[in-house]
């Protein structure tokens, strides 16, 4: 009997140990941050944090999703805006081009541009209760003008989106609000089981384009037309093929060391922001709730995409890696000429670094 009890105790201990090590790995507890960053960087202060940055390469402008997300974490009633930078004129200045005029609420998240159309995810004040929406805008020389609001029950927890035509787009749901799974499945979801979806809007209706993804926090399209999606909980970028009916076919994935967020695309280059340490990010959010500030590491990586390679990557390079004391919680990196623009989940600034020095 004693031997049986000992075996059972040993099994429980081993299972607990394996689970603890697995969770420590998922939370990046053992990750060591060896800083690598350009020698010349400067901050441009904002009224809130720019969680997403979308560059209009045709017109030389950057659009920023601005919201006081620190205030939001602390329970404040905040409203956001879309900012614009004229990249052709130095020094760069932030111009507010939309502050929610005509809307009851404006809390922007992911952005996308195609031609003269800009779209933004808009979160309600009561997330998980009130409907999420997509706001569409027309771009002109005068700025941007709000066109319409798109709503669908399929937009459960939208995080990012990508236009593939001026009236067609894909929207990625993360895991924050998912009413289609039970409590046990939510635990499995946190452990990495894929329950997220990508939604397709065809100009009139929305439908599910892809299922069983591990929390989609970034979406973009390559020059060949492949949809690439950040699967944050799986530390990978999923590569998907567009089908004629708007559905997406899973082809493969790009493995990453960090948990990916927003993705920018310029030619063959994919620039992906990553959470280098999930445990540090959690501590950062907890500190903000307490009115303190504890930085979280920031990571931006460049991937040269090649569709006919087995791992889809011809070259990798760390563009920016820091402990977060310069800019914390980096959520997006976008390149204009020889400059890297970095946005953050919570820091009220963007960080601009000179590349190639």
Where are these predicted regions, by residue range?
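A short helix->beta-strand "capping" segment at the edge of beta-propeller domains
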Residues: 27-49, 94-96, 144, 312-323
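Beta-strand-rich domains and repeat architectures in extracellular enzymes and scaffolds
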Residues: 42-80, 327-332, 346
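Beta-rich, blade/repeat-based domains predominating
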Residues: 47-56, 100-115, 152-168, 192-197, ...
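Blade-loop segments of beta-propeller domains
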Residues: 50, 68-71, 75-115, 119-124, ...
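Short, conserved, GDST-rich strand-edge loop motifs in beta-rich repeat architectures
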Residues: 64-78, 121-129, 171-193, 273-297
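Beta-propeller blade signature
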Residues: 79-88, 131-140, 188-203, 292-309
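Asp-box/WD-like beta-propeller blade repeats and closely related beta-sheet repeat scaffolds
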Residues: 97-164, 172, 176-177, 183-185
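Loop/turn-rich, solvent-exposed surfaces of beta-rich toroidal or solenoidal domains
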Residues: 257-320
